[in-house]
């Protein structure tokens, strides 16, 4: 089967935004204008197509990044059809993982900002993730029809708060109630969309006389930005020659692809204005799969030889599974992005991460939660496979004869855990199944059984994250659960170096004995310097401990790291140097050396100034001005460190660093302090030493 759309006409994009910037409505309008959706779904009444999980419709926030395919031929039908694959990304901070994983498979992104609220704290988190994956992006300033809307103010914030280089592609004509359309700064024409057909048709008109000077000024700014793309254009521009529309667009595209500028458009998705021109900007300025660098990976040759795959049907098949979802009708759906090659339904592919073969039974392309079955997918496509057996988010799927392991995604460690138990004993097994499935979908969510209490523990990125997991168990798997009090994921570490710590395990009374003897140094590592948080150096000279026992020493220490001597929390940032010891020809064994190492570790840890580490959260609170004092006072009582504040149209944004243990129930407290007018977001920042009184209380509570 031949390719229907050339790969250069593909656009794999994400639509990313702060909560309430109107991202879902914007996506809905895109689906409407691209002809997929005949009736526009409004988030206000819970009917939007992209928000397909029930909780999202209730909470009015987008949780799961659904992938949707649409076609666009331009507002004035000026292009060949372009295939736009849209990945919807959530804006809530507890779902940062969803944003992260979608950024990994995008080629470009549209950042949606609210014309009133501007660049919010959450927008900065998303921006950092887009920077990390070097995603070219454009911005859409939405809600121009709202009270207090100000397009150029938001352009200024993109520069000051995100450190970006924004270049307006349009200007808003009017604002609030008087918002009627936009000025196209490339064509230097006003665009007015027709209300009667929900903005499907439009007219080019002259720029309003009272905006001519402003339009000239920003047109000049746009031309200068374009001219900076090459010396040739700069000479032409400085020589007083006019740049053609084609030259301007080509130059701006090049600068967007190089991540040098952010083109900014505006509109009101709700009022059917501006989304159509933003779609044109997606086609004109965002990359196709062939415009972005080839994807990197390593060969499965035992040497980790670097390799890459280019976006071409002729290269061997390679894809990345970026999301696992459970569908009530077909079971497991594995969303994947094809980077190279072609795969047909019925083909067998390899998952090199698990060394397992998988058969692609049915392949579907998703439109929000409706699906269309297809026979093949090619380089650049995003699709979902039904019924793959053992694939986790971040796994590679590739041609078994040309094995490559694509770069893995990085997932954050959970910072909060709670115990859960089913309301009825009969549901125990069902709960285990449900949690196992949900953990497969979401790598930032973990499940395990506490060995001492035998309770099931679930852990995630925040209270909302775990609330939604419990909620999904009830809705999707019919399992009602009771939940315990949230627990903080503390860590243990040392702050001093200790040397010549001895560990000896000797039992030599009759029969075959046991003998292991080690001497180690222990020292703290710089936090984050070692991805494993642990290093082991073997400095044994002259065979005082035979080589075959060295791994047992390492293993003996690693087993102790799982539950530290202070309060039973994992030990991090620790280095160990093994430099002396002794053995017995007959009585020594791996087990004896493992035990000797654990004795030395426990002794050394106590002497090396052990500390309890607690997770510190970056907290940002947006509050009306009159409540600022109360909010700051409350954060200080929670051991918060103030890191600054700034005013905006809607009030004051307070930046603070607060221990997670002090943030439980914060949403309720903030609501009562500000009569429900404040909002906050928090994300994990770092681990830091817990003060003595806090550490003492935690240690006593653990009964250590």
From Swiss-Prot:
<dbReference type="Pfam" id="PF00009">
    <property type="entry name" value="GTP_EFTU"/>
</dbReference>
<feature type="binding site">
    <location>
        <begin position="142"/>
        <end position="145"/>
    </location>
    <ligand>
        <name>GTP</name>
    </ligand>
</feature>
<dbReference type="InterPro" id="IPR035649">
    <property type="entry name" value="EFG_V"/>
</dbReference>
<dbReference type="InterPro" id="IPR005517">
    <property type="entry name" value="Transl_elong_EFG/EF2_IV"/>
</dbReference>
<dbReference type="Pfam" id="PF03764">
    <property type="entry name" value="EFG_IV"/>
</dbReference>
<keyword id="KW-0963">Cytoplasm</keyword>
<dbReference type="InterPro" id="IPR020568">
    <property type="entry name" value="Ribosomal_Su5_D2-typ_SF"/>
</dbReference>
<keyword id="KW-0342">GTP-binding</keyword>
<feature type="binding site">
    <location>
        <begin position="17"/>
        <end position="24"/>
    </location>
    <ligand>
        <name>GTP</name>
    </ligand>
</feature>
<dbReference type="InterPro" id="IPR035647">
    <property type="entry name" value="EFG_III/V"/>
</dbReference>
<dbReference type="InterPro" id="IPR004540">
    <property type="entry name" value="Transl_elong_EFG/EF2"/>
</dbReference>
<dbReference type="InterPro" id="IPR009022">
    <property type="entry name" value="EFG_III"/>
</dbReference>
<dbReference type="InterPro" id="IPR047872">
    <property type="entry name" value="EFG_IV"/>
</dbReference>
<dbReference type="InterPro" id="IPR027417">
    <property type="entry name" value="P-loop_NTPase"/>
</dbReference>
<dbReference type="InterPro" id="IPR041095">
    <property type="entry name" value="EFG_II"/>
</dbReference>
<feature type="domain" description="tr-type G">
    <location>
        <begin position="8"/>
        <end position="290"/>
    </location>
</feature>
<dbReference type="InterPro" id="IPR005225">
    <property type="entry name" value="Small_GTP-bd"/>
</dbReference>
<dbReference type="Pfam" id="PF14492">
    <property type="entry name" value="EFG_III"/>
</dbReference>
<dbReference type="InterPro" id="IPR009000">
    <property type="entry name" value="Transl_B-barrel_sf"/>
</dbReference>
<protein>
    <recommendedName>
        <fullName>Elongation factor G</fullName>
    </recommendedName>
</protein>
<dbReference type="GO" id="GO:0032790">
    <property type="term" value="P:ribosome disassembly"/>
</dbReference>
<dbReference type="GO" id="GO:0005525">
    <property type="term" value="F:GTP binding"/>
</dbReference>
<dbReference type="InterPro" id="IPR014721">
    <property type="entry name" value="Ribsml_uS5_D2-typ_fold_subgr"/>
</dbReference>
<dbReference type="Pfam" id="PF00679">
    <property type="entry name" value="EFG_C"/>
</dbReference>
<dbReference type="InterPro" id="IPR031157">
    <property type="entry name" value="G_TR_CS"/>
</dbReference>
<feature type="binding site">
    <location>
        <begin position="88"/>
        <end position="92"/>
    </location>
    <ligand>
        <name>GTP</name>
    </ligand>
</feature>
<dbReference type="InterPro" id="IPR000795">
    <property type="entry name" value="T_Tr_GTP-bd_dom"/>
</dbReference>
<keyword id="KW-0648">Protein biosynthesis</keyword>
<comment type="function">
    <text>Catalyzes the GTP-dependent ribosomal translocation step during translation elongation. During this step, the ribosome changes from the pre-translocational (PRE) to the post-translocational (POST) state as the newly formed A-site-bound peptidyl-tRNA and P-site-bound deacylated tRNA move to the P and E sites, respectively. Catalyzes the coordinated movement of the two tRNA molecules, the mRNA and conformational changes in the ribosome.</text>
</comment>
<dbReference type="GO" id="GO:0003746">
    <property type="term" value="F:translation elongation factor activity"/>
</dbReference>
<comment type="similarity">
    <text>Belongs to the TRAFAC class translation factor GTPase superfamily. Classic translation factor GTPase family. EF-G/EF-2 subfamily.</text>
</comment>
<dbReference type="InterPro" id="IPR000640">
    <property type="entry name" value="EFG_V-like"/>
</dbReference>
<dbReference type="InterPro" id="IPR004161">
    <property type="entry name" value="EFTu-like_2"/>
</dbReference>
<dbReference type="GO" id="GO:0097216">
    <property type="term" value="F:guanosine tetraphosphate binding"/>
</dbReference>
<keyword id="KW-0251">Elongation factor</keyword>
<dbReference type="Pfam" id="PF03144">
    <property type="entry name" value="GTP_EFTU_D2"/>
</dbReference>
<dbReference type="GO" id="GO:0005737">
    <property type="term" value="C:cytoplasm"/>
</dbReference>
<keyword id="KW-0547">Nucleotide-binding</keyword>
<dbReference type="GO" id="GO:0003924">
    <property type="term" value="F:GTPase activity"/>
</dbReference>
């Amino acid at each position: 089967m031949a390719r229907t759309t050339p790969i250069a006409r593909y656009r794999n994009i994400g639509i990313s935004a702060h909560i309430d910037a109107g991202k879902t409505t914007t996506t809905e309008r895109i689906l409407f204008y691209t002809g997929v959706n005949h009736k526009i779904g409004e988030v206000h009444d819970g009917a939007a197509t992209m928000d397909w999980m029930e909780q999202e419709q209730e909470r009015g926030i987008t949780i799961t990044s659904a992938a949707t395919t649409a076609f666009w031929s331009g507002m004035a039908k000026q292009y060949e059809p372009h295939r736009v694959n849209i990945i919807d990304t959530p804006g809530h901070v507890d779902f940062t993982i969803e944003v992260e994983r979608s950024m990994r498979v995008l080629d470009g992104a549209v950042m949606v900002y609210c014309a009133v609220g501007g660049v919010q704290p959450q927008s900065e988190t998303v921006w950092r993730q887009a920077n990390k994956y070097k995603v070219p992006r454009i911005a859409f300033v939405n809600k121009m029809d709202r009270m207090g809307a100000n397009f150029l103010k938001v352009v200024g914030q993109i520069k000051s708060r995100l450190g970006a280089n924004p270049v307006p592609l349009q200007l808003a004509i009017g604002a609030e109630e008087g918002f009627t359309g936009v000025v196209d700064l490339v064509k230097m024409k006003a665009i007015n969309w027709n209300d009667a057909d929900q903005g499907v048709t439009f007219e080019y008109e002259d720029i309003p006389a009272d905006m001519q000077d402003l339009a000239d000024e920003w047109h000049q700014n746009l031309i200068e930005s374009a001219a900076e793309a090459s010396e040739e254009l700069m000479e032409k521009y400085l020589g007083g020659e006019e740049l053609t529309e084609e030259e301007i667009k080509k130059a701006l595209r090049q600068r967007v692809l190089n991540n040098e500028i952010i083109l900014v458009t505006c509109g009101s998705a709700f009022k059917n204005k501006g989304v159509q021109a933003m779609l044109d900007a997606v086609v004109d300025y965002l990359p196709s799969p062939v415009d972005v660098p080839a994807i990197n990976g390593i060969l499965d040759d035992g040497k980790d030889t670097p390799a890459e795959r280019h976006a071409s049907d002729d290269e061997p098949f390679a894809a990345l599974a970026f999301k696992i979802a459970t569908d009530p009708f077909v079971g497991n759906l594995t969303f994947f992005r094809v980077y190279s090659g072609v795969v047909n339904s019925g083909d067998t592919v390899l998952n090199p991460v698990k060394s397992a073969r998988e058969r692609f039974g049915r392949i579907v392309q998703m439109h929000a939660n409706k699906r269309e079955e297809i026979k093949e997918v090619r380089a650049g496509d995003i699709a979902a496979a039904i019924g793959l057996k053992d694939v986790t988010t971040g796994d590679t799927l590739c041609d078994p004869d040309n094995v490559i392991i694509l770069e893995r995604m990085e997932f954050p460690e959970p910072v909060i855990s709670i115990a859960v138990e089913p309301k009825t004993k009969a549901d125990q097994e069902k709960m285990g199944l449900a949690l196992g499935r949900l953990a497969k979908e979401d790598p930032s969510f973990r499940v395990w059984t506490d060995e001492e209490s035998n309770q099931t523990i679930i852990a995630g990125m925040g209270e909302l994250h775990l609330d939604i997991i419990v909620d999904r168990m009830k809705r999707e798997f019919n399992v009602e659960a009771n939940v315990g009090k949230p627990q903080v994921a503390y860590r243990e570490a040392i702050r001093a170096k200790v040397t010549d710590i001895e560990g000896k395990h000797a039992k030599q009374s009759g029969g075959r004995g046991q003998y292991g003897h080690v001497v180690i140094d222990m020292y703290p590592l710089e936090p984050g310097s070692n991805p494993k948080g642990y290093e082991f150096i073997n400095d044994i000279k002259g065979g005082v401990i035979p080589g075959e026992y060295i791994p047992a020493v390492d293993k003996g220490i690693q087993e102790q790291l799982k539950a530290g001597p202070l309060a039973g929390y994992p030990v991090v940032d620790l280095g160990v140097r093994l430099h002396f010891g002794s053995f017995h020809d007959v009585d020594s064994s791996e087990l004896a050396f493992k035990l000797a190492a654990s004795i030395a570790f426990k002794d050394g840890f106590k002497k090396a100034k052990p500390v309890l580490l607690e997770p510190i959260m970056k907290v940002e609170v947006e509050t009306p001005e009159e409540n600022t004092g109360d909010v700051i006072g409350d954060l200080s009582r929670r051991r918060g460190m103030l890191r600054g504040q700034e005013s905006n149209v809607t009030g004051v944004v307070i930046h603070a660093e607060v221990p997670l243990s002090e943030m439980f129930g914060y949403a309720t407290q903030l609501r009562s302090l500000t009569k429900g007018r404040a909002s906050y977001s928090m994300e994990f920042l770092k681990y830091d030493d817990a003060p003595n009184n806090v550490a003492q209380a935690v240690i006593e509570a653990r009964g250590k």
